[in-house]
């Protein structure tokens, strides 16, 4: 590798079983004859910055920490950004920023879509991202746009003509835009930089050594540059993990998805036969690692080479899988915990490093969370998505809340975010928001916007009078803060169209205003720390980029704003952010790209499910696989081959390797990765059936035992026995029936004082429908008492009129549209029934919604409201209960379980209803008012009404006596078959637990 004016290509490989960067460092140090000055004169070209850092760390390991002058390193993949490859040369035009390009492309897409009548700004922005990807692919693969028309298959020619017409954006309009603005596409600029460097080195070969290491030459420009480096007087190319042992027939047969496919393609670009590639000096590995590499090589053989499976000795296979373990977890959480436990255990050995390699960012996040349980933060190469950081979440919540016009759920999500302070002390603002929620947002949704909140406040103030003044005062402060901070943005979203840059500026102003505290401006709060700095930089870039996009309808703004965060990661500094510890120096989480060329004593390959690793093959939205090939783009299967190479290298080189997957992801069953399936098949063919990849520790058992209790003692049924002084002395008729069926509910409601908190955005339900029907009929009956019978048509109109007012007050147009016809049918049925009753009985006194109250010995008060009581000609009473739901069975009435109506009759007998006067019931009836095909039905209660009333009163007195005994417990649901169908207190009584039901 010396500077001897050699022109034959110098191509080496470091075998897959050897740690690449450590072997590279050792070889360079040996070639420099351990002379630091000679080493410093070398230039090493590596694929990534992380690989460059890894090489520096490898040199430190080589010298056992002694300082060393290092060779100059160039990160090939980021050469355009760094501007180091072309040092001293004329540079091509600067690269257009990613956001600016997407915004400008979106404007072109919008113009196309508007011409077709299907314009959508957020869709156009995302489609612009797909076009940008296509542009970069075309640039990297050096595909000629003029060949687009030739790519179509005859069967799809008509469809392809439409696609070509749309792709004029990239073939015609976009090049003109770049030329007008003096810019270049990033990938095209990188290709130009690489090509300029190649030509420069060909014209003026450097005398100092140049080593290009670790690249598989994924794009033609890199391949040409490597070919030039290999022929420099002091140049060399070092390939990662070229399989020199595969026989020629198998080598010729490998396809795009094989691990060696990329290297085979690169050798063709280098003009070098595989037999000409030499092992990197000193890069041999121990027998155990070589055996592992042979196992992996045989496992990955194409079909034509599978005959070699039979030629592998069984003992060699056993040696090859030593240190290799596999775990199939039940789900993602269990997989993450298993990985975290294995990584934590690695720290028990001094100097031992552990790394998780996975393309699954959700799994990486779960592992980070599991490690945090042990007080550890791993060095995560991918960082954290900007949209998932505190400022990113806050900004997204703000846009959602404003786009949904301050609907309760998104509004509260925003107001409860730690960055929201509304110009107050943060703690005071949190307390005010909680009171604001209780006072105005629980229950039915207020009308939209600030005006809707103000109307809800005015309504609550009218109802409250002197009640809850503190809550209403806090609500007023929150509304004022919202008006001050979000008002301009809400106004900007009301126009028909607005420039997106103006909407972004209004969004950022609103975010800063709402983030302000009583002592600090919002900008200081929002843009602080690493995540805030990254968000500020992204928003500044977006402000400039969106100037190049035309006006959009405001309803597109949430989708467009969300797209601004796509693909942006925040990398935390190794020293740790505020509130977080520094990443552990021996624990790593690597993405697939970052893991290339890296090594650790324990490597865990996680997320090995088909569709995740490898990812599902996607040719993209523009062309089919054959069309891509004809056009000159890489086959989608090439990405699988690249991923297979990464897996093969990792499997071959780690002293200890753990392969993990989850059997179910998000509740759905998964399929093992094709590489796991191949490995299983290979091992079964060599060693027979069995569990051959047992990990060194039972990580699965440990993970499952970690949170398992020593023993499970079932909780007995609740048996609260409060003191008599705390037991309720006032119950409604409905509550008496509840006391009979579920005493615990009365205990929770009246003794503990617990009430169900209304839901946010609580939907209008059947209870509201029942209230509407009851109120409408009661109003008509009261009016009839004053004015007399008006006739069927008028009586029906009275019911419909009051019902319409009640429905309108619910402010639920969809429900109103459904219920109005039903109400009309009920009104007609009730009016006709009333006319028939008059014809049969003549006029009677009818009382509607009659309140009654009965004071009993011992200070107990029984109260209730009867739907309707008629005093008949003989002086007896008829009680009618309207039901829009289910009517109780006759058997339960006779057994005094359904006692509400008979108990009202007993109260009437005792003079509880002052408006009606004392009287004995002679008739009890239910009116089923559904409003459907059969609008109503009368169901008289069978049996003697007075006797049923007496039985109900006896049951009531027995209940009273029972719960006047201090030893009597308020059991939950003592008779399950008689229990209420619905209850707000089942979870408090833990019925499912002691009742044997599923949680």
Please identify what each model-predicted range represents:
Residues 1-787, 792, 800-813, 829, ...:
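Polyanion-engaging groove/track-forming segments
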Residues 519, 667, 711-999:
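RecB-family 4Fe-4S metal-dependent nuclease core
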């Amino acid at each position: 590798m010396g500077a001897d004016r050699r022109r034959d290509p110098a191509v080496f490989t470091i075998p897959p079983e050897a740690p690449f960067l450590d072997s590279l460092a050792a070889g360079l140090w040996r070639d420099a004859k351990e002379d630091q000055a000679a080493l410093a004169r070398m230039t090493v070209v590596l694929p990534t910055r992380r690989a460059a850092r890894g090489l520096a760390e490898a040199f430190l390991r080589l010298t056992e920490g002694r300082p060393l002058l290092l060779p100059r390193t160039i990160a090939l993949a980021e050469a355009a950004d760094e501007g180091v490859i072309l040092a001293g040369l004329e540079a091509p035009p600067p690269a257009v920023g990613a956001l600016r390009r997407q915004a400008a492309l979106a404007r072109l897409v919008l113009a196309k879509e508007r011409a077709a009548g299907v314009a959508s700004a957020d869709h156009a922005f995302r489609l612009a991202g797909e076009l940008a990807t296509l542009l970069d692919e075309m640039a990297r693969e050096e595909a000629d746009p003029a060949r687009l028309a030739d790519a179509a298959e005859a069967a799809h020619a008509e469809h392809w003509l439409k696609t070509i017409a749309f792709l004029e954006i990239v073939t015609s309009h976009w090049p003109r835009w770049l030329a007008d603005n003096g810019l270049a596409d990033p990938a095209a600029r990188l290709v130009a930089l690489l090509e300029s460097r190649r030509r420069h080195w060909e014209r003026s070969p450097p005398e100092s050594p140049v080593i290009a290491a670790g690249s598989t030459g994924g794009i033609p420009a890199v391949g040409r540059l490597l070919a030039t480096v290999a022929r420099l007087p002091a140049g060399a190319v070092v390939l990662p993990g070229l399989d020199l042992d595969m026989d020629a027939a198998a080598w010729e047969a490998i396809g795009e998805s094989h691990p060696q496919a990329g290297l085979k393609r690169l050798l063709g670009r280098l003009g070098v036969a595989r037999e000409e590639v030499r092992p990197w000096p000193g890069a041999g590995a121990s027998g155990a690692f070589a055996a592992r590499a042979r196992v992996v090589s045989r496992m990955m053989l194409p079909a034509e080479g599978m005959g070699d499976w039979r030629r592998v000795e069984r003992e060699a296979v056993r040696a090859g899988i030593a240190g290799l373990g596999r775990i199939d977890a039940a789900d993602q959480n269990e997989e993450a915990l298993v990985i975290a436990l294995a990584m934590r255990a690695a720290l028990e050995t001094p100097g031992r490093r552990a790394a998780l390699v996975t393309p699954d960012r959700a799994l990486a996040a779960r592992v980070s969370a599991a490690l945090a349980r042990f007080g550890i933060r791993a060095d995560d190469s991918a960082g954290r998505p900007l949209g998932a950081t505190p400022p990113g979440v806050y900004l997204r919540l703000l846009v959602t809340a404003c786009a949904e016009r301050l609907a309760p759920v998104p509004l509260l999500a925003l107001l409860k975010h730690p960055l929201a302070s509304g110009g107050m002390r943060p703690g005071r603002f949190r307390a005010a928001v909680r009171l604001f929620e209780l006072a105005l947002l629980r229950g039915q949704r207020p009308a939209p916007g600030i005006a809707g909140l103000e109307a809800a406040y005015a309504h609550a103030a009218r109802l409250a009078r002197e009640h809850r003044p503190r809550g209403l005062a806090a609500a007023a402060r929150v509304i004022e803060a919202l008006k001050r901070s979000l008002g301009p943005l809400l106004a900007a979203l009301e126009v028909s169209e607005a420039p997106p840059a103006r909407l972004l500026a209004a969004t950022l102003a609103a975010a800063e205003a709402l983030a302000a505290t009583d002592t600090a401006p919002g900008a200081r709060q929002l843009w602080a720390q690493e995540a805030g700095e990254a968000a500020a930089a992204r928003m500044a870039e977006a402000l400039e980029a969106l100037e190049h996009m035309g006006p959009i309808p405001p309803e597109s703004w949430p989708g467009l704003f969300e797209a601004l965060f796509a693909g942006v990661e925040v990398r935390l500094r190794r020293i740790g952010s505020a509130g977080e510890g520094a990443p552990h120096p021996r624990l790593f989480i690597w993405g697939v790209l970052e893991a290339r060329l890296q090594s650790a004593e324990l490597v865990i390959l996680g997320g090995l499910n088909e569709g995740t690793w490898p990812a599902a093959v996607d040719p993209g939205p523009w062309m089919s696989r054959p069309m891509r090939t004809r056009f000159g783009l890489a086959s989608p299967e090439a990405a699988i081959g690249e991923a297979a190479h990464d897996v093969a290298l990792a499997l071959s080189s780690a002293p200890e390797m753990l392969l993990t997957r989850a059997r179910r992801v998000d509740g759905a069953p998964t399929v093992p990765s094709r590489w796991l399936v191949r490995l299983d098949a290979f091992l079964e063919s060599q060693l027979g059936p069995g569990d051959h990849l047992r990990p060194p520790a039972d990580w699965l058992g440990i993970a499952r035992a970690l949170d398992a209790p020593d023993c499970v003692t079932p909780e007995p049924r609740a048996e609260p026995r409060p003191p008599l002084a705390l037991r309720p002395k006032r119950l409604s008729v409905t509550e008496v029936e509840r006391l009979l069926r579920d005493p615990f509910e009365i205990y929770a409601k009246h003794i503990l004082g617990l009430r169900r908190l209304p839901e946010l955005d609580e939907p209008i339900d059947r209870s509201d429908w029942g209230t509407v029907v009851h109120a409408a009929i009661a109003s008509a009956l009261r009016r009839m008492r004053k004015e007399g019978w008006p006739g069927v048509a008028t009586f029906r109109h009275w019911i419909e009129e009051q019902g319409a007012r009640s429905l309108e007050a619910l402010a639920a147009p969809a429900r109103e549209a459904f219920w109005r016809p039903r109400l009309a049918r009920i009104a007609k049925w009730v009016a006709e029934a009333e006319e028939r009753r008059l014809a049969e009985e003549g006029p009677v006194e009818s009382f509607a919604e009659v309140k009654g109250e009965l004071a009993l010995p011992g200070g107990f008060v029984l109260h209730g409201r009867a739907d309707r009581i008629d005093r008949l000609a003989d002086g007896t009473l008829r009680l009618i209960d309207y039901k829009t739901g289910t009517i109780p069975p006759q058997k339960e009435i006779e057994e005094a379980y359904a006692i509400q109506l008979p108990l009202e009759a007993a109260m009437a007998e005792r003079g509880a209803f002052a408006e009606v006067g004392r009287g004995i019931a002679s008739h009890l009836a239910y009116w089923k008012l559904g409003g459907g095909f059969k609008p109503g039905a009368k169901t008289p209660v069978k049996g003697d009404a007075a006797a049923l009333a007496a039985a109900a009163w006896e049951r009531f007195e027995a209940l009273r006596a029972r719960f006047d005994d201090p030893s009597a417990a308020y059991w939950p649901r003592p008779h399950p078959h008689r229990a209420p169908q619905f209850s707000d207190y089942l979870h408090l009584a833990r019925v499912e637990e002691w009742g044997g039901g599923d949680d």
